[in-house]
């Protein structure tokens, strides 16, 4: 076992091969040039953005995004981000299963971790009781003229159109729609083609 001081680039200075590691998305992004030092890596603590997933397609390290929260004490599902098993679907770990509540938010059943079902605010496309596709947060939904828009879904689709800029989708009050969708892009000017 190798313990490393907390850093935004945990692979810096590592010379030996590591069988298994864990990072946050920021650490992963900063470690891409040395990632081949790690055989298998889990990434958690935040969503891995699509541009970073693209960068992972040519690395030898098998990288998995984890899904979990404080209430589960650990991750409860994983999805492969690269390699032949790459997927956009999270799969439950052993002895864990899922369902939806009335809001279409994920409910986690992990009795070894918590005897009560854990109700989340995560909107998901539930594929079956063991797998789901994460869509976004219930708290972020924009209701525009009665249509519920999940900002995270729109942002994922725009990520290839808005290159090299940080951006987000937000709701803004509108007299006729209730809320309208607004794209906020960092920077002074932009050319979208």
Task: Enumerate the language-model features and the residues they cover.
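AMP-binding/adenylate-forming
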Residues: 1-30
């Amino acid at each position: 076992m190798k313990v490393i001081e907390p850093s935004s680039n945990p692979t810096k200075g590592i010379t030996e091969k590591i069988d298994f590691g864990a990072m946050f998305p920021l650490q992963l992004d900063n470690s891409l040039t040395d990632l081949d030092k790690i055989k298998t890596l889990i990434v958690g603590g935040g969503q891995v953005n699509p541009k970073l997933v693209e960068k992972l397609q040519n690395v030898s390290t098998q990288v998995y995004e984890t899904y979990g929260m404080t209430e589960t004490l650990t991750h409860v599902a994983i999805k492969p981000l690269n390699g032949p098993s790459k997927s956009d679907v999270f799969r439950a770990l052993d002895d864990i299963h899922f369902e939806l509540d009335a809001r279409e938010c994920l409910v986690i059943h992990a009795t070894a971790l918590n005897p009560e079902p854990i109700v989340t605010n995560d909107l998901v496309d539930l594929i079956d009781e063991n797998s789901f596709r994460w869509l976004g947060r219930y708290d972020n939904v924009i209701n525009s003229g009665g249509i519920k828009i999940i900002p995270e879904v729109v942002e994922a689709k725009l990520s290839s159109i808005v290159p090299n800029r940080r951006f987000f989708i937000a709701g803004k009050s509108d007299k006729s729609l209730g809320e309208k969708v607004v794209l906020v892009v960092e920077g002074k000017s932009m050319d979208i083609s």
